[in-house]
Amino acid sequence: MAKQIQAIRGMNDILPTQSPLWQKVEAVLRSSVAAYGYSEIRTPIVENTDLFKRSIGEVTDIVEKEMYTFEDRNGDSLTLRPEGTASTVRAGNEHGLLYNQEQRLWYMGPMFRHERPQKGRYRQFHQFGVEIYGIGSADIDAEVLMLSARLWEKLGITEHVTLELNTLGDPAERAAYREALIAFLEQHKDKLDEDSQRRMYSNPLRVLDSKDPQVQSILADAPALMDYLGEESSQHFAQLRELLDAVGIQYRVNSRLVRGLDYYNRTVFEWVTNSLGSQGTVLAGGRYDGLVAQLGGKETPAVGFAMGLERIVLLLETLALTQDIPAEVDVYVAAMGDNCLVEAIKVAQELRSALPTLRVMSHCGGGNLKKQMKRADKSGAQVALLIGEEELAEGVVTVKYLRNDNEQQRVARNALSAFLAELTK
């Protein structure tokens, strides 16, 4: 027997038993962004490597350690996209979507990072994100947070997630704070872990995000970014909090919250949960007003967020919130005897035409009634429609209930569509 080929480590199949939950999550995401008037954008999985070096930052973990990068036959350096924002900006610049325009966009698709696979963190993962361009005021920051809060409400996990909020100020304010933070860290250099020492000069704000307990203890006395904010940044953050208070979205200001990507400024946020262990962040984002110009466009304010679908699915499973996932099939059509096969197929086709949302599965492959009923039960259908010689002669179909103890009944074929529409509504 030939050796089986396995999936690449950290790149997982989504099996038929799992896909209904994924479809439910995706449907919630699509309906939510539609309710806010956002438009979908789809970008290639592969981009020029320079796109991510220029946007994410060359000294970030993603660019230094995690990207899937290769040379094609022309000698060009290409990368499987590790996140969606940079591709969205590239597409907006390339196609003239962002110049003097407001755009509210969303995307969904696979991303790739060469990380150590663990629960909730994979090398191929599916990301959903929204990106808004051309609006620099705090009200649009509030809108993306209201949209994210609506997602949790529709998924039934509002009580299990918490919003953490911070501001990074504008580039000048952040530069001044950066110098103060470096000066502080230099005083404690010998006590910093290896990662923090490496980041101290290249990306000191990332030290604030260290998980090392000793580093966190040192940071308790570090200068606060809030003390370096100018009036405009302070007002922006104050207005955002006022708007969130007005609509009842609770949050916690976390002055240590920074994002792992270099392009963020002012508002940054994360939705976190205590239900997934170390992988507690379920959605993250913020404002990135300089990225469009950094990638060759005009100065354009921008804000957005991204979330990993694997982590949302895992959270729903962990919280046992998967019971209401419907079966893939509503009705199973079975023929009792070879002479009835043609009519059974015709009944199934008639139902699909009359009731486009009804999910109808026809039995194929022959077999006795017991075998067909076993498959019908396994399909998850509510009812089986049985068509035999007697049913054909009388112009009826026998309806057998599979999920309750109701007695089977006969329904006239010309009334079957109306009967099933009422039964499955």
From Swiss-Prot:
It is an enzyme of class 6 (ligase). It catalyses: tRNA(His) + L-histidine + ATP = L-histidyl-tRNA(His) + AMP + diphosphate + H(+). Gene3D superfamilies: Anticodon-binding domain, Bira Bifunctional Protein, Domain 2. It comes from the Bacteria. CDD domains: HisRS-like_core, HisRS_anticodon. GO terms for biological process: histidyl-tRNA aminoacylation. One of its GO terms (molecular function) is ATP binding. Belongs to the class-II aminoacyl-tRNA synthetase family. NCBIfam families: hisS (TIGR00442). This is Histidine--tRNA ligase.
